[in-house]
Structure formats: C-alpha cells, structure tokens
Amino acid sequence: MTTPHTLLRSLPSDLDPNRLPRHVAAIMDGNGRWASKRNLPRVMGHQAGVSALKELLRCCKDWGIGALTVYAFSTENWKRPQYEVEFLMALFEKVLNHELSEMVDEGVRIRFVGALAHLPGALQSAIEGAMAATEANTAVEFTVATNYGGRQEIVNACRELAEQVRSGRLLPEQIDEKLFAQHLYTRELSDPDLLIRTSGEQRLSNYLLWQMAYTEIYVADVLWPDFDRAAFHAALQSYQGRQRRFGKV
C-alpha cells in the first residue's frame, strides 16, 4: 500500500532544493493534549512524539536539510508533575541507547545544548557517549535542547564575558555580536532559518531567543505526534513563499 510517507520520500517537486532552509528549529508542542484526546496518560503523548521526531529527522536527511534543532526539555519543565519529569528523563536515556547505532549508520551527528550538568547522571553519560559516537557524522546536525532556557543562556554568556573583563582579558569595547554568540550553547551552529511550532500556539517559550532574530516562524495547527512529512511539506511551502529581508527593503 502506498502511504503519504512513501509518496513524500523524496523532496516534493514543488519545492526548490536551492531555497530550502539550511537549519530548521522545532518546538514540539502538544504531546500531552494528543494523549488527553485519546484518554491516555500524558506520558504516552511523549512516547508518540518520539516517533514523529524520528520521522522528521529522516525527512531532513532525505530532503537535504542539513541541521535540525529541537526543544526537548526547558528549564521551566521541571515544574511539571514529578512522575512526568522522571518519565521524560528515562525516555531520553532509553531513546539515546536504542537509536544510537541507527544514528551512526545514517550519518547523524547529535549534540545536546543546555544546562546539562543538572540532568541525571545516567542521562549525562548517555549524552556524552552519543555525542562522541556521532562526532564525525555529517549527514544531518541534530541538536537537542535539553534543560534549556534562552534567557539563562544569555545570562550565562554575559557572566562569562563580564568575568573576562574583570580579569583584564577582555576590553568592553571588544564585545560585539560575533563574540557574544561564541559564548552561547549554540556557538557551533548557524542561526535557524525556519522555526516550526506545532499545536497552534504562537509564542517562543524561551527558545533560542538570541538565535532567532531573523528566523521565519511557521505555526502548524497540528499536535506534535501528528506532525508528519505532509505537515513539514506545508511548512516548507510557506517558507519558500516568503521573501527574507533581514531588515532590508
């Protein structure tokens, strides 16, 4: 049987391969609502969301999009019920251990950004192992923002630069946007060209606040576990229909 996924295995013909976003960021919103609509525990929505993420990552590789950054766990998410937080930490570790060999084979390089030192020790070890195992891969740069907060990232960068000024290693007038960006978690990444947020919500939720100064934003009226290649196709159609001015006329 032909499915929508097989129909969209290759880049759709109505998309210009030369005008694809180089770097896509995603806020994977709606897992809990997806589960509630089906009378399932919220954690089952997170489990279903993993499948949607795997498919998006495959799609980026198939369609020639070189970088994907996703918002997996924010600094504010610790306020969720303890059982849900514990489930998410265990889920991250399980997915890393289970999917690592496939990521290596598929050429995916995985990075984690955020306040990683505050994560459980076993998860930190899994993260370190996955990043080391995929460091040489070049097919897709897959970045997972975990225990990440955009404001805290900016504060941390300010503190680092302030300490350099205090110690005499840096003059205040030497600080510019380029130097500041080198002190962010994402210093090895280009800024996102396109942000996709699912579930219809229209806010940034403290995500990549510095990096998305000129990012195109697309809000998908679909819950994250239902975000598929057809939905991604629609996002890319919208992106290619825009003229990016970067402040110019």
Curated annotation (Swiss-Prot):
Positions of Mg(2+) binding: 29, 216
Keyword Transferase attributed: yes
Keywords: Magnesium, Metal-binding, Transferase
Active-site residue numbers: 29, 77
Gene3D superfamilies, per database record: Decaprenyl diphosphate synthase-like
InterPro entries from the UniProt entry: UPP_synth-like, UPP_synth-like_CS, UPP_synth-like_sf
Group of enzyme by EC: transferase
Binding site for substrate: 30-34, 42, 46, 74-76, 78, 80, 197, 203-205
Cofactors (names): Mg(2+)
Binding note for cofactor: Binds 2 magnesium ions per subunit.
EC number: 2.5.1.-
GO BP, one annotated term: polyprenol biosynthetic process
Classification via Pfam families: Prenyltransf (PF01255)
GO molecular function: magnesium ion binding; prenyltransferase activity
PANTHER family recorded: DEHYDRODOLICHYL DIPHOSPHATE SYNTHASE 2, DEHYDRODOLICHYL DIPHOSPHATE SYNTHASE FAMILY MEMBER
Known partners and oligomeric status: Homodimer.
UniProt record similarity statement: Belongs to the UPP synthase family.
Protein purpose: Catalyzes the condensation of isopentenyl diphosphate (IPP) with allylic pyrophosphates generating different type of terpenoids.
Annotated HAMAP family: ISPT (MF_01139)
Designated name of the protein: Isoprenyl transferase
Originating species: Gloeobacter violaceus (strain ATCC 29082 / PCC 7421)
Organism lineage: Bacteria, Bacillati, Cyanobacteriota, Cyanophyceae, Gloeobacterales
